[in-house]
Each structure stands twice: as structure tokens, then as C-alpha cells.
């Protein structure tokens, strides 16, 4: 039985508290509105079998990073490692080998403790598992604390994230974080307790690179980089590697744009008015050349979300255009051979979403796969959560000074049919209301030593580096305001995606 777990989550500091609510909702009755009437912070969890089409990648060989016992305990996570970066201020972004999560290595403290951090444009706060944590989940991850650094300063400011079956909580600490050629003293959360849910989380923490609420009292990592004038330009450029292409050029560039990663020019869209996330206006969705007339939609551009998540009515319309697509038990299904041409139009440009990215794993019915375009009413009636299903097809730029997002068609070396972008006949712009900040984390249950499905244990992921950077021309459209490794053949046995929504208040307020 599949379930959709709707959980109200509160993020707390000394200045902010919240309440907890838990809403189990059986699937496939997923067309009912799930937007909570509660204030503060909302979290919703999607639980389902693995949605990745196994035939999509065939047998995927992944590097398994194994370090000394004092470096990583038993958390040897599989990953497709990005190539070491050659450009300054660039950090490699790795993936789990199945294109569900993207993460990088960050060194923390005076001794440079290595932590695998989820790269998240939907969050502004940063946190790690603390070494004083005795929870089982912390034992499966790298942790960081007083014994790992001579420069750490522990505050008495409480910090925590509470959700349905458990929580992560601790205090705010201050110490050095080193990444992409920067060494930055910054505040971040240190988790001293963590629920068993985190046994399945691949990351040791989250590196939040989303925009901050202007009322927040604590600066974010990106704000500190800008305040100290460490960036050539106050932009961040991201390209996510696609495992099925064998690509290893995933990277995030701080302060610059890598022209080699995209074709054509970057087209910019302004963030919607009063938006405290990377939310931009979208024009339409085009399928096999036919406009669906999905006007007035906005999308939160979120590297931390695996799927394309949109209101059920929009998902229904999209799947009505796919031959033999059916509303299955919680998710749409479609023929695994589906090749419908899907383009998302943003800023007057149509960006292709490859079938490999929206067609998921095969179901119990041979030849039938799950769709990774998911219908859920988790945001507003015209708001979409635009995650990695789309973002693997583009190079994305996040401009903090001009409060805008730039997109261009992504280049994949050696790809016969790379993602493309073509001008659309016109665009419709909408000023959207303030909507939730978004971060997401997924869980993979994988046996890191064989291709047999394990009966228990933890999933996988690590991280390393990737690529070069140059500047380019630009165009604008948008809303008018405002350390040894080995290899194994791995097959995912199940997947849980947790999509987090923070409403109205920052974790760091």
C-alpha cells in the first residue's frame, strides 16, 4: 500500500516555535487539497516504490567511496562522482547514479571534516549532523563537533526541525566552511538528535543557497560570500549531470557562469514580487507541438526536488496528451516507450524535457512505467515545483543582485540528441503571491556491494568535484517587479522522496 504522508513541521530557534500535526492520506485519492491551514512551517512527505526506470540506465556502475573509520563509519554511499573542477570557485556536484539527488563535498572546521551536503536552491539555511548526536541516523553519516575543530563556537541558540515521526534538533554553531576555493566563517545548525528516518538520507547536511527572507536575523552562506565581496559577481551557475548519459560534469560555480555548459544565450526571468524563493513566471507547456494553454503558472526552481510536481488538474491535462497514460495507484503510469515531445516555455523560450527524465521505472505491468510528472496540490492552484526532471535539461543561473533566474539549454558531451530550446510564439507573465520555500531530500535503499535487493540497512551517496567557467552574454524576460574507491552494479529497491515546504518564516529568522 502506498501512502502520502502530510506532516506539519516546525522550525524553531529561540525566537520561533511551532506546532506539530500529522496527516496520513491514502493514495490514489490525491486530488484533494493538501495545503495546510496551520501557520509556521509545513512539511509533506511522498512515499512510494522506486520510480526510476531500471532499463533507463541498464546496469549502472558507481564509485563507492571508502575512507578510514574516522572519516566515514559505515556510511559508504554509492554515487556518480563529478570530474574535478578546473575553474576557480567551482564545486563538483555528484549524483546518486539515478538522478534523484545532487550533492557536493564541503569541508567544515579547522581540520576540514568532509561532509556530503545536499545542494539546495530551495533552502537558505545550512546544517550538519553534530558529533554529539547518539541517534542511529547520525551513526550512518559523517558528523561534526568540538573534537573535529579548534575554531568551533557553540551558541546557546536552539535550532531544530520537527516532522511526523521524528526530528532533527540541536543548536546553532559558528565555524569555518571550505568549498569551491572559499573559506568562510558562518553560522549553521548542528543536529544533536535525529530520527531514524535519517538512516535513509544520503547527505550529512544541507547547503542552502536559496534567497533569504529579508527579515531574517542570521546571514546565509551566500549572503556572507556577498557581504565579504568574495564573489566576482553575485550569481551562482548550476548544471546537473544526467546519470544515463554517463555525464560527470555536474558543478556549481559561485560568482561566475560557465558558458561551455549550455548552447544559445541565457534568458532571464525575474523572481515574482515579494518572493523569498526562486519562483518565476512560466508561459505554457507544449506537447508534440500543441500548446496546453497552461497560462499564469509560476514555478519554484529547486535543485533539491527530484520531480516535476504540479497541481492535479495540470497533471491530468498533461497525461491526457500521452497515449495510454493512466492514473495509477498514486502516480500516473505511461508506456515505457513514451517519446512524447514535452517543452516547458519560460521567458519566451521552449526548453525540452527529455523522455528519459520524465519516464520512471517499470511497474508490475510489463512495458508500463511510472511518470515522474507528479500531480499533488502542495502549493497554490497555479504554482509548480520545478525540480531535477526539468533542471537536468538546462543550465540555470541564480542572480542575487537582480533577483532573477537565467536558463539556457544544457549541453551534454557526446549526446546525439541533447536538450534543445526554441523560441515560443509569446509569453504570459503573472505576478504570483508569496509561496513556500522548498527543499527536498530523497532516500534510496541500496545494497552497496551487490545488485541484490537488501532487506534492511541504509542507502547511499558521496561527493567530489567538477569543471570550468566563463562568462557569457545574456537576455532578460520576466515579471516586472521587484579516498579509495571501488565499483559495484547497483539497483534501487525503493525510494522515498521527502518534499519540504517552509511557509512564512525562515529557519534562521
UniProtKB/Swiss-Prot annotation:
Lipid-modified sites (GPI-anchor amidated serine): 485
Top-level taxon of the source organism: Eukaryota
Location of this chain's protein in the cell: Cell membrane
Record-level GO cellular component terms: plasma membrane; side of membrane
Database matches in InterPro entries: Aspartic_peptidase_A1, Aspartic_peptidase_AS, Pepsin-like_dom, PEPTIDASE_A1, Peptidase_aspartic_dom_sf
UniProt GO MF annotations: aspartic-type endopeptidase activity
Propeptide stretch(es), residue numbers: 486-509
Protein family according to the UniProt entry: Belongs to the peptidase A1 family.
Protein name (database record): Probable aspartic-type endopeptidase CTSD
Species this chain originates from: Trichophyton verrucosum (strain HKI 0517)
Native organism taxonomy: Eukaryota, Fungi, Dikarya, Ascomycota, Pezizomycotina
Gene behind this protein: CTSD
